[in-house]
Amino acid sequence: MSKYLLRRLLILIPVLAGISLILFTILAMAPGDPFEELATNPNVPAEVRMNLRAKFGIDDPIGVRYIRWFSSMMRGDWGFSFASRVNVDTLILQRLPTTLIVLGSAQLLAILVALPIGTMSAVRPYSIFDQIATTLAFIGFSLPTFFTGLLFILLFSVYLDWLPFIYRADISATGWRFYWEHLRQAIMPVAVLGLFQGAALTRFVRSAVLDVIRLDYINTARAKGLSEQVTIAKHAVRNALIPVVTLMALQIPTIFTGAVITEQIFRVPGIGSLLISAILANDTPVIMAITFVFSCVVVTLNLVADMLYGWLDPRISYR
């Protein structure tokens, strides 16, 4: 296990380097100028704009700019935001915890919804419960997150007035009231993301469990006298989770994409809203840093998924 993990970590180095090179090249070739706003300002002389471009190396060759950026990033210097006038790492560290909390809670909700419903649908295929669950699952992952987000706002914020529809970071409450207010305003973005992912995951859990419960070793476990609950939970579901874990790892980029949209709808001060603001302002250092952080998180979580295979199925050996 340790040798396999070390080998995978060493493989991540050229993978992340290649990802950073591709991202940097695409952003460098994309249209837009971070100093375009200064060009329309008559109070900023042309000499000042030229000096700024020379200082930040905007007109240097792409290869030179990439080497400079990558070496600076390895030293912990992620650049300077042209729009916010703040270091990029400071901006990301301010927003990243909020995004990770929302995404982690949404993924946990998706698992808590998908596992029991998908398993019960597989155990009782084509029953009334299975048909209702299948219908709701199809509706859940057919509706985009921006549409369900607007529906949630209309229902729970406008008509019922139960939940705030704008996420506020500057809550003045103290004590338990502070945590309660944060929980209330996080319910809708977490529910929108979690139910969307849970709907798709439910179908895959059902399919995976349905394939496993027809195998011979499940019939053998029943013949030994094990209860149906133990047979399904201990022997069927655990082995059926391997393709589900693979799917969850592959869906991580989709989750981040949904988070970008959801943060815009509910005004969540996370990485997604920061990325949209940086794109609109042509703030290349911030865009590059955020996309690279997303790539690192995706690659790391896929490595974690590979590690989970051995825990789910002890027959899998890491060499």
Question: Model-found features: residue ranges?
Answer:
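N-terminal signal-anchor/signal peptide hydrophobic helix marking the start
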Residues: 6-16
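Residue-level recognition of pore/gate-forming positions within transmembrane alpha-helices
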Residues: 12, 42-43, 138, 154-155, ...
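Membrane-water interface segments at the C-terminal ends of transmembrane alpha-helices
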Residues: 22-29, 71, 135-166, 192-198
